[in-house]
Amino acid sequence: MGSGIETMVEKLVVPTVKVACGFKVEDNELIALVGFAMAPTSREVLTKVSFWLFKINGSVLKCGICDRGPLTRKGLFLHLTRVHREEVKALVRDELTRELKKVAHAGKADLL
């Protein structure tokens, strides 16, 4: 992948983990990270990837990657950013690539 996508992936790791832990990511924060044009696509990526990063069993919060828990929201945030950063980056990279391909195909269809 291009270095532009890698830069964006790195910037989206922390917001993705924040969403997974139930913390808010404001639109202004996202716009500051990736720019106005990429903010909606980035929001879609955050939402989709964050779903896979946690599990709730009753009232117990666990890591969705290694099943470690019980964890608090802050504990899950620290665990995901420190232990599973590379896995989160890979998930974000895959989903971002998928979303960008959808946008590219939609743009080509509009031109026809």
Which residue ranges define each predicted feature?
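C-terminal recognition-helix end and immediately following basic linker
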Residues: R43-I65, G69-H105
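Intrinsically disordered, low-complexity linkers and flanking regions associated
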Residues: M1-F51, L96-E99, A106-K108
